[in-house]
Amino acid sequence: MKKPALFVASFCLLFLLGSAAHAQQFDLTFGVSGLTGDASTATLQTIGGGAYPTFGMDFLFYHHLGVGFNAAFRAKQNIFQGFQPFRPFFYDVDAVYAPPLGKHAQAELSAGIGAESLRFYTPFLTCGTFTGCTNFVSSNHFLGQFGGGLRLYVTRSFFIRPEAHVYLVHNQDAQFSGSRATRFGVSIGYSFKSYE
């Protein structure tokens, strides 16, 4: 009696997994963005400015819900307080909701957590046993991320996505004029879809 029940349970599980796999989507994106931040004060500068190359991916696995990862960094170093080169990096892992809007468009909403890594460059190398040698010191901050975009499909799989992301960075205001940064940009992407 146990073998038929096990067989039926296995068949049902296989059927459920097969139908879940039917509605999967994996996306890769590359783009460029600009960053704005709170206005400078008499003693602190803004984190805004510069071009930010971006990379992202997401995996939608249940009714257009899924998880994603985004990374953005300033392409060229900026100068901190008039003398020290620095470069910000933003990383986040998100929950993603991407419902279709007809045949050639798809909305994308995301919210998640991550980190901002501020790299302050020095004129000398610092070497460590496990880290090797680097010419920068990092200041890392926890962040929350909220974003949105609109995927406009130019083919079945290729899309262009205007996007905006708001970063709420914990303790960033110790070094810059505020704890908020907003990234606006455009990405191109490719969708690997198992359904249409």
Give, region by region, the residue ranges found by the protein language model.
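Bacterial N-terminal signal peptides that target proteins for export
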Residues: 1-9
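Sec/Tat signal peptide C-region and signal peptidase I cleavage site
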Residues: 19-23
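Surface-exposed strand-loop-strand hairpins of Gram-negative outer-membrane beta-barrel proteins
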Residues: 33-54, 139-140
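Bacterial N-terminal signal peptides
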Residues: 8-18
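Gram-negative and organellar
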Residues: 32-34, 130-134, 144
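Extracellular loop and loop/strand-boundary signature of outer-membrane beta-barrel proteins
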Residues: 40-43, 78-84, 130-136, 171-176
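Internal, hydrophobic beta-strand segments that form the core of beta-sheet-rich folds
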Residues: 164-165
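Gram-negative (and chloroplast) outer-membrane scaffold detector with strong preference
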Residues: 27, 56-130, 141-144, 152-156, ...
